[in-house]
Amino acid sequence: MSWIARDTDLNPNMTQAEQENNVNIIAAYFRNEGWTDNAIAAMLGNMQVESYLNPAQWQHGLNYSMSGGFGLVQWTPATKLSDYLGAGWRTDYDGQLDRIRYEWQNELQWTWNVAMTFHDFAVSTDTVDQLTYVFLRNYENPEDWTASITVRRTNANNWYTYLGNTPTPALGIPIWLLFKIRWRGR
């Protein structure tokens, strides 16, 4: 499955099917890391407001400025992501997920506006509404978080419903290889 991305600082006009394509990639990645669907949906609801789920999204109105935000979660400044990923960073969309994993594993980018660690967030079975709020306040942390909490929660709950009807694509070792390894071990 390939990412759908539009390099723009405007609304990329992503269709529902295009957003679902990117959601499938994101969900498979973080399910493989052990995240709950509640946490994944909360992150997706926030990402949809930040970037329309477009991994090549630049911050609106800043004319592709590196001092503005970029990517799924709008890393600000964009150098947070470019310095981490190095050459080819603008099209390394899987690398954005690796960056989030790195931040999660090292408790980076995470503030303490709400008393929950990034580790606890990822495995939480709290409500999607609560986790959307936690991700907004502890990760995104905009100046006026009240302006978009309702739409972020609506998005997150929609993605939670979607994820409940979407099986996880296989990642890692193919099942046939596991049987081959087991058979050789006899």
Question: Model features per residue range: what roles?
Answer:
Residues 31, 35, 48-52, 105, ...:
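Hydrophobic/aromatic-lined pockets within catalytic cores
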